[in-house]
């Protein structure tokens, strides 16, 4: 058969293309094998084959998922580190093999950006030690420790740390975002109680960041975003004892009560005494209120609530309890509505495993040294995974949301179906604590309240999923121009309509860029909304 000149050219092009694709596939395969070989040598603490997961493993799907069920991010390899030195070696492996390294402490990233496509995920969940000092004023704590396990470990020394409520959130992500809690109006954010941190840099070196060493890095890693400047492997935390508290939980089951309760909450809660921090949880047809009076008595709290005006709305169910120790305070409104003696407290929900999440579908679960912090009490039930869709907004002190706009938003929530499990978790801020340190979190002084919205997306019904996504797009379009640009970096949103760097980092952006340039000039540690070593588009420095 004779080929025309054109046919010959096309045949040659196809042959070249096939050859190029074959070479590219071979190169990728060789790179992956090079990475795996290096990682095998880096995991010096043993159990190498168990601590490396790639797409050939039947536990890969479980291992790549954190809390969010998603089918967008497929890392090349997941390595479960046990010591800081392993993390340093793993970073060097990624560099040599041509891969990015992505740290994962708790797996709660709202967009699943702690397991990015084609990367080496360095999982820190087994760097979860808690070493309390002899005088119990400080502790060295692994960045992968989950909050529930941390609190149980500190209970043994009759001390604690002002972190959040969710027991499966890890310390690394909490501090990197700022870290708010039901004690924050009196005590400030979790990041303020970090005395130092050890950080693996992009070149694989391990440095200590504190107020006297690598001060710029120390500033950035507290509230300047996670997985950006280096990989934090552990923290030195300042510990404390909480005074006994009084707790309140109030619920309303009439849909018509949602707006008046929420409006009263925003008018009243953020301007109460700093010892009182509270939130409302707004649903499709109900609303509830939760508050902690740190150091207050039951009578003091009853007086506060009686004067709030909340009890004049609808027919509320009210629970108020006093003399609540630290664990009772954290459990109140979630697993109990009564503060009981310490030896009667059911702390099961806090006794989370290093791998705490529920099984997804019939995919086998990854298990490695999955032991609870306290083997003497029942293990926490697996934390449910779901397809989260969410948004975050800060209400600023100089831009309080008008009542009519709040009502519109609540009416929008009522339009979603029951399957969405729509939830607005709205916290009173207006932090007046004098403990503020110099750190990167940008909204501490101006935040009046924080509003998070979330639904359970549908994995099986594309029409329903599209409806939910449009609802969030409509919420962004309606609410963002009215409430402002500020959002919480711990609740990132790929579909935010504003410049994400301005929204998450505010006036800290330019200083954070300088830190990034100093410690990671080649942008080795990155995710779609991470600070870059050059000034981001739309930002003026």
UniProtKB/Swiss-Prot annotation:
Record note on disruption phenotype: Leads to the accumulation of pyranonigrin G.
GO process terms (BP): secondary metabolic process
Cofactor(s) this protein cannot do without: FAD
Signal peptide coordinates: 1-20
Glycoprotein recorded as keyword: yes
Domain FAD-binding PCMH-type: 71-242
Role this protein plays: FAD-linked oxidoreductase; part of the gene cluster that mediates the biosynthesis of pyranonigrins, a family of antioxidative compounds. The first step of pyranonigrins biosynthesis is performed by the hybrid PKS-NRPS synthetase that condenses 6 malonyl-CoA units to an acetyl starter unit, to form a 1,3,5-trioxotetradecane-6,8-dienyl-ACP. The enoyl reductase (ER) domain of pynA is likely to be functional during the first two rounds of polyketide chain extension, to generate the saturated C-C bonds of the alkyl side chain.
UniProt protein name: FAD-linked oxidoreductase pynB
Organism of origin: Aspergillus niger (strain ATCC MYA-4892 / CBS 513.88 / FGSC A1513)
Organism ancestry: Eukaryota, Fungi, Dikarya, Ascomycota, Pezizomycotina
